[in-house]
């Protein structure tokens, strides 16, 4: 085994550089959060063309005495790829376009959610959690589960729902264009855990003869209004799931333990017709092997798996792990349809 003393100077320098890059990467995200709070992406968009530093600082809600520091913030954000700089003017990059508040497809709320103190504190408590009997690092940090915390903090719940909605906009665009066949022939669909209905609205619009129902906890759907072939129903998926030709679970199961996933899936199975009559469950989730074979820069499931541990003590799953859940829940047939990088559409039939 090599030691520091036996390593070459070049190796040590590379190691230190790698370590520094990883360690200080948080500063990029903290700076991005600052940019969102100040409204920098939207200020550039509203300007209609690249902005010079003077124009930008004048458009931001900052103290005049702090204006000289904006160029240092922008320098970091340009290096991180969120903005572009040319001839002393700043513009949005394709990544930056995803940060616009009023664009339906955006990750602004997701960024703010991931950098919210409520989600950062459990990571700080991770080592403490390994040495205690708490169910999750989130409980160690806050004294209550993630879902209890969310139900008691309306502002945090709103941010969480907005983050999930932004994610659903992109997924829905792909689903109703490239994977329409998944929904063809269905007369009714229940989106379990569908939040404010972003995904279900897109499906309902694309399939006007398909009756779509969003089923979620009362606090998630209390302020939502149905329209045409879309309605909202309050309830708990651990108690029951409304009957339909198909049940949709978009990135729901990775929030839960194997035992709870089986409970959810069994309730879904009870609510759909038999296979010969077209009953099925449609799952959108990550599959670990697919990420390993993706061959791109998507850094996802290892990081997301750790987040599932920290927040819920749940996990991302392999095909083998998914198959066991399906079997335990009484499903005899399933197929994996690769969709977005490591994300899969999984069709289950009884």
From Swiss-Prot:
Disulfide bonds: none
Regulation: Inhibited by Co(2+), Ni(2+), Zn(2+) and Mn(2+) ions.
EC numbers: 2.1.1.396, 2.1.1.395
pH-dependence of activity, as noted: Optimum pH is 6.8 with cephaeline as substrate.
Primary location group: cytoplasm
Coiled-coil annotated residue ranges, if any: none
A single GO BP: isoquinoline alkaloid biosynthetic process
InterPro entries cross-referenced by the UniProt entry: COMT-like, O_MeTrfase_dom, Plant_O-MeTrfase_dimerisation, SAM-dependent_MTases_sf, WH-like_DNA-bd_sf, WH_DNA-bd_sf
Gene Ontology cellular-component terms listed: cytosol
Keyword Glycoprotein tagged: no
Protein name: Cephaeline 6'-O-methyltransferase CiOMT
Organism: Carapichea ipecacuanha
